[in-house]
Amino acid sequence: FEFVILDVLNPNYEKIDSEKLEKLVKENAVALDIRLDNQWKKTGVIKGSFQETAFDINGKFNVYLMDKIRALAGAESQEIELIFISHDGKTAEILGNAFAEDLGFTNVYVLDGGIQSWIDSNKPLEKYN
């Protein structure tokens, strides 16, 4: 059994570092921290970010995530600059691709390395209650 890779598609989202995340948030991008509640409490959260869990502890998708994004973005939700933040960046990449490819969002970003890269860059975090 043999197969040939004809093409490798680049993701429809952009991986960004901590510096670019700070810049985009200052320019009113929506930074959405999609980790679990216990993770927010453990590490804290990025100032200016919004918290909405994407998947529960059992891996079930949060069906209210789109409602949260629409509430934050308003009528032009697909054109907002949307940044996903996860623990290590992997879950954010999955959502980033889905929002860009399947839902038509045009300005999707993922914090490369997730909250851990933010911590490793010695960036400040706020306590989450």
Stretch-by-stretch model annotation:
Residues F1-E19, L24-A29, D37-I83, H87-N129:
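Rhodanese-like catalytic fold shared by cysteine-dependent sulfurtransferases
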Residues L32:
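Active-site flanking residues adjacent to catalytic metal/cofactor-binding acidic residues
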